[in-house]
Amino acid sequence: MVNKVETGFIRTEADEVHYNLHIMLRIELEVEVIGKNLEVPDLPEVWNSKFKEYFDRDVEKSSDGILQDVHWSIGAFGYFPTYTLGNLNAGCLFEKMQEDIPSLADGFEKGDVSLATTWLTDNIHQHGSLYEPADLIKKATGKAFTSEPFLNYLDEKFSDIYEI
């Protein structure tokens, strides 16, 4: 189910609500390891403890926990925040896209994404890597980068679905 919200072990299978919590867990552990406040051999135990704290679930096997991502095993530290930055940037862009294209939702309901892809081409893709991300967001949206549009999106979407 596309809009179902529930805690799960695997980051890449997480819903929109929990995905960034998965990222937060990883970032917190990276900061501790890089800051020499946590030793690598202690990671599995700390992972499981934090996972229980954040998701209220017990990790029973490492493949559902600390070993599910390849990032750390290939030395890709500091990469996880880019996923959340992408979500936050998407929130900014989607908010502006909806303002600029009142019929956007109607197109999506019909399976037509051409309005969105045209908007992205005109406002993002044509610039390539000419601008720093924050500058590109400001240029495309007229506003500074913020998490507010993404949080509003989650609130609006899931408040309606779950009647909260």
Regions found by a protein language model. Name each.
Residues M1-I164:
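Cation-handling catalytic/transport regions enriched in His/Asp/Glu
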